């Protein structure tokens, strides 16, 4: 089976659904952000602060292309879709899943999360604007799942059905 790439905005459920899908399909799951942190020896927040977003996006593209393209679930960072080369790579090397969640619901989920470098608690409008700027890229995915106010079980049932179509 080709790789399954899980995309979506921060807080949409990529990591949670990736882990659940991994158990269900008996496939390994790899998180691009975690792999970048391991390779760079620092957390993403520090990469953004010390090297900037452009450096992080370069690490992200390099990491994406270094991962297996068969029998693995890859959970991605929310901004991986910003680079056309990344979108092309994922579409050519696997099935791309877009987890959509209403950005206002995400903002509520992330209100107290200090590990998200692009989430500004005080500026929900900027958060929604960033989401909307990426939306067309996310929608290039093969499979779309709306996770808004759904349980993991509901999302998994819908995702399994669409993967098997």
Curated annotation (Swiss-Prot):
UniProt EC number: 2.7.1.71
Cleavable signal peptide: none
GO annotations of cellular component type: cytosol
Localization, UniProt: Cytoplasm
InterPro entries cross-referenced by the UniProt entry: P-loop_NTPase (IPR027417), Shikimate/glucono_kinase (IPR031322), Shikimate_kinase/TSH1 (IPR000623)
Cofactor: Mg(2+)
Pfam families named among the record's database cross-references: SKI
HAMAP family tied to this protein: Shikimate_kinase (MF_00109)
Functional summary from the UniProt entry: Catalyzes the specific phosphorylation of the 3-hydroxyl group of shikimic acid using ATP as a cosubstrate.
Protein name in the entry: Shikimate kinase
Organism: Bacillus anthracis (strain CDC 684 / NRRL 3495)
